[in-house]
């Protein structure tokens, strides 16, 4: 039966104790990590979120009843122990912060017993993630997950402190909002009072933070919960957290400057890492041309080389056709990989096909200078020599080429570059390389929808010098948009916003909105623009992804207390679940089963 902690008050967390506390009487409380009974001598490791301390029950130093009680302790029992801190009688444990000391107890209370847990609570558990997520409250006891959440809390606290000192106001925006179909799917919430109508959960506080600028608040921030009904992957969740901000009377440089100082503070105070300022900047066009990605990992080289002009007159039909169809030929140089086995090269070809490429052409330069190529017979010796020279090829190098439309070539070689970096172990997790990517295209063409869509969102300001093309050549227009990239991951993005009614109307028109549709969906914002709008800009970080990278984790699930899995379900609470028919009736909702598509043969 559980004992009361009445009369006891915890004096220290377990790992707060040190050699400086020797001789002090202390009260510790926590979970039993391990219990070792050596007959008349019982060692109990007690754990809380700060760490572990060893408690020693020994004949001659502890009462027999106390030793007997300690021998019955099991893993995850919750205990309170009163005792004296002493130097360890045995060997020092260098693996523990408290490894020099132990506690000699005079009182033990069992506050709560535990059944045998489904897995051992330990660092870097090898237990299947599905099991750990089902018992997440146990999983969260593990020291590595606790460190991640402690780090997350510290990042949030430091962010609040920094932004408050910079004159930002923390203002909450609504969670029940109007649905706008542009972009990813909304989560919808039915209204009981206004049946047949729905709220949406926000994908970001975008419109409200712009309205706060219209309202004269100047500098806003919020650590905001956001929601997106989309297919999940390692770095996405249906509900996620943003560090969101907006500033008035600023331009691109102002937003970048304050955020560079924020990042420098976070990395210095949380990780002890100095961020060199100013952070490097690169236009979207340069990033795509050099790295095949708008979020390039610049911890390593292996940049793309455009060899279109070098091979434009060759007879290799793959290169020839791509160039004639308005495409390009580009390559990457995998240094030292010239001896790669053909089977591995074939796997790289298959990898490339996943990104839309029809294949990969290659030149393998062996250490002895001999050249093996998939297309040598279609090239003259001089053409081959010129191509190798253009690629910076040396003995021992593997040159890989893609030829197609720009997007296919960029996507293929950008992904291949990262895959080779992983295989060649070029990625250092202890290195943090930041990059600003700027001047994104304002719009991108959607083949599926047969229209332009906003690359960021419909409220992004075009660059002044490109405004002249918004009607005649919208695909040419660049945006005053910027993303902050860390080690090949976009951790934040923002833009200068449109604050001119005419430009906003043109933007809606290019996106295919009629005046009525624009008014229906964004009328409140357009009306606000009639009453004096300051120039404004903002940025939002994905807090989950930022902490994931700072904590050197591979999934954001490891930095979120209660995450969802890939089908957007919660294995612990079994959400989503069915609801009572009466609740649906109150909402005026009937659930209709999806009809299965009939086989054509039927």
PLM regions: where:
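Class II aminoacyl-tRNA synthetase catalytic cores and aaRS-like
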Residues: 1-602
């Amino acid at each position: 039966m559980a004992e009361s902690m009445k009369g006891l008050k915890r004096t220290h967390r377990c790992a707060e104790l040190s050699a400086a506390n020797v001789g002090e009487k202390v009260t510790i409380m926590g979970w039993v990590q391990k219990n070792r009974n050596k007959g008349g001598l019982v060692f109990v490791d007690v754990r809380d979120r700060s760490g572990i301390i060893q408690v020693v029950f020994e004949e001659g130093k502890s009462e027999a009843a106390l030793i007997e009680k300690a021998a019955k302790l099991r893993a995850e029992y919750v205990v309170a122990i009163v005792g004296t801190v002493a130097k360890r009688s045995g060997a020092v444990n260098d693996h523990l912060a408290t490894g020099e000391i132990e506690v000699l107890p005079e009182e033990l209370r069992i506050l709560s017993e535990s059944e045998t847990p489904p897995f051992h609570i330990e660092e870097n558990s090898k237990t299947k993630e599905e099991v750990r997520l089902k018992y997440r409250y146990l999983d969260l006891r593990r020291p590595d997950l606790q460190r991640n959440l402690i780090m997350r809390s510290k990042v949030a606290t430091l962010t609040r402190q920094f932004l408050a000192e910079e004159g930002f106001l923390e203002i909450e925006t609504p969670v029940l909002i109007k649905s706008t179909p542009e972009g990813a799917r909304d989560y919808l919430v039915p209204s009981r009072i206004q049946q047949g109508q729905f709220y949406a959960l926000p994908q970001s506080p975008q419109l409200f933070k712009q309205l706060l600028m219209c309202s004269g608040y100047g500098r806003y921030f919020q650590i905001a919960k956001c929601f997106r009904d989309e297919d999940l992957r390692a770095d996405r969740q249906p509900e996620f957290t943003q560090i969101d901000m907006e500033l008035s009377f600023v331009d691109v440089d102002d937003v970048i400057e304050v955020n560079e100082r924020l990042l420098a503070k976070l990395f210095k105070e949380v990780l002890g890492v100095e961020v060199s300022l100013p952070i490097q900047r690169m236009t979207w066009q340069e990033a795509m041309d050099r790295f095949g990605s708008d979020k390039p990992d610049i911890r390593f080289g292996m940049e793309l080389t455009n060899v279109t002009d070098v091979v434009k007159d060759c007879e290799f039909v793959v290169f020839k056709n791509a160039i004639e169809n308005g495409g390009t030929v580009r390559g990457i140089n995998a240094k030292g990989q010239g001896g790669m086995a053909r089977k591995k090269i074939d796997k790289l070809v298959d990898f490339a096909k996943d990104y839309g490429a029809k294949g990969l052409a290659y030149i393998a330069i062996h250490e002895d200078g001999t050249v093996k190529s998939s297309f040598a017979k279609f090239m003259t010796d001089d053409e081959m020599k010129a191509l190798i020279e253009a690629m910076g090829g040396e003995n021992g190098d593997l040159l890989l080429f893609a030829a197609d439309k720009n997007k296919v070539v960029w996507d293929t070689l950008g992904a291949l570059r990262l895959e080779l970096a992983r295989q060649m172990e070029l990625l250092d997790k202890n290195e943090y390389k930041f990059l600003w990517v700027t001047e994104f295209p304002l719009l991108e063409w959607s083949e599926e929808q047969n229209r332009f869509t906003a690359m960021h969102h419909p409220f992004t300001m075009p660059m002044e010098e490109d405004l002249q093309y918004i009607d005649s050549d919208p695909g040419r227009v660049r945006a005053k948009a910027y993303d902050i990239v860390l080690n090949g991951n976009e951790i934040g993005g923002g833009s200068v916003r449109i604050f001119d009614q005419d430009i906003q109307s043109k933007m809606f028109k290019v996106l295919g909105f009629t005046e009525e549709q624009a008014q229906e969906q964004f009328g409140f914002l357009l009306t606000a623009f009639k009453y004096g709008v300051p120039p404004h800009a903002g940025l939002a970080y994905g807090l989950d992804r930022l902490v994931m990278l700072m904590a050197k984790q591979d999934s954001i699930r490891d930095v979120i207390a209660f995450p969802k899995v890939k089908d957007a379900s919660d294995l612990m609470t079994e959400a989503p679940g069915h609801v009572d028919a009466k609740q649906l009736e109150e909402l005026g909702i009937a659930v209709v089963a999806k009809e299965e598509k009939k086989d054509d043969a039927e």
